[in-house]
Amino acid sequence: QVTPMVSLGATYQTKTKMGKLDKYKGLFAEQGGFDIPANYGVGIAAKINDATTLAADVQTIQYSGVKSIANPASNTAPLGADNGSGFGWSDMTVLKLGASRQYGNDLVLRAGYSTGKQPISDNQTFFNILAPGVIEDHLTLGGTWTLASKGEVTVSYMHGFKKAVTGSGATTGINLDMYQDSLGVAYGWKM
């Protein structure tokens, strides 16, 4: 906390080693390896008044450190080999903006937006049919209502705006597009 109104933060997560996906050892590079990539970021939150907080984060995801994600699909090595085809994703930097507003003691409403540069190039669409993660922009809305019984209900909604990547070169005609919607409801109880 820099001042009573402003907080700064930084994060770093190393690559997380996952067990081999044995059923996919002939598909994913490194005999079915599929680790979670390292990522790092910085953020700031400003308490505008007693009820309102605004926040901004910048995060970089290092897809290049995981061969099954980063290796280009144009490799001539066999599928599943250490240098075999992957999804061809580039590292990605994501900007996130958020706001939170407290209404009395019982209700908090939240909104957020994130945007990032496309990690999939237009010549890497073939292998990405399996995981067409092409969305660049997301909007989130949510709120938490505290109940008299010490319980709380949280509702959240996320919309990933439609994005398309049109294949080129050897992947001409293999086009990807995606949008997402997600709705969540959770109940919690405070002891």
Regions found by a protein language model. Give the residues of each.
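Outer-membrane beta-barrel porins/channels
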Residues: 1-191
